[in-house]
Amino acid sequence: MMTKNPMQLKAFIKNKAAEKHISAQLVMQNYMLERLLERISLSPYKNNFILKGGFLISAIVGLDTRATMDLDTTIKGFTLTHEAIRKIFTEICNVQIADDVQFEVVGISDIRETDDYPGIRVALKANYPPISVPLTVDVTTGDMITPREVEYTFSLLFDDRTISILAYNLETVLAEKLETVLSRNIANTRPRDYYDVHILYALRGAECDKATLRRALERTTQKRGSGVILTDYPEIMKEIRESDTLRKLWEKYSREYEYAKDISFDDTCNTIQTIMDAIMA
């Protein structure tokens, strides 16, 4: 989208934020991530990047239903090194689009080993002076996608058009979230994991193939060494339901995000239990 000046862009952002009941900062962040994603889709690396995580979930269910601040991707066809990623992102930043935005790579660092997948974190800036928005892109490799990635049609925030990008299929998104919730048990401090499972299943559950989801979950737990959750999930869910800490974290989350305010912690637990009972029967 071309705008006359940065003030006009800010006005568009403010209106969209009011319409979707989320902060203008979140809308700006998502707009700039979208601008980066379009550059990836027009780059020679279009078929090497696979979109996953919060930004994909937001695209599936709607920005007013799930917001995120960063971009998660997995890459194929490349060895994951700082040098390779810097070169790739420098080229992506140099893709010219008529949207007034210029990107720059600020830094490259390793993702902590404690995260689900080790990988590389790319810090960037999206500039439309005087607007400057810091962005983070996480890049992993070797992710288990079952059965395979799909071509996802991504609708743009302000333009009446779409871009095409490779992405996780729905079953793999759900499998990773289920594994995270169950394997971390009461040690999980991220209410959004519960929300993601609940909202994805509520809005897209009918499109989810149960056999594929089970296989995706089995392969994810195999990769992460957490296969015990497949048999122990009833006991794990009992512990989760009885955790005062998790309930308080959920209550805080549902107060902070308008889209979660009418969903209870029990609702999310019931959804997880329903999915697990259905696929493990």
Question: What are the roles of these predicted feature ranges?
Answer:
Residues 56:
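Catalytic metal-binding/acid-base residues of hydrolase active sites
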Residues 1-49, 59-67, 71-281:
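Structured mid-to-C-terminal alpha-helical surface segments
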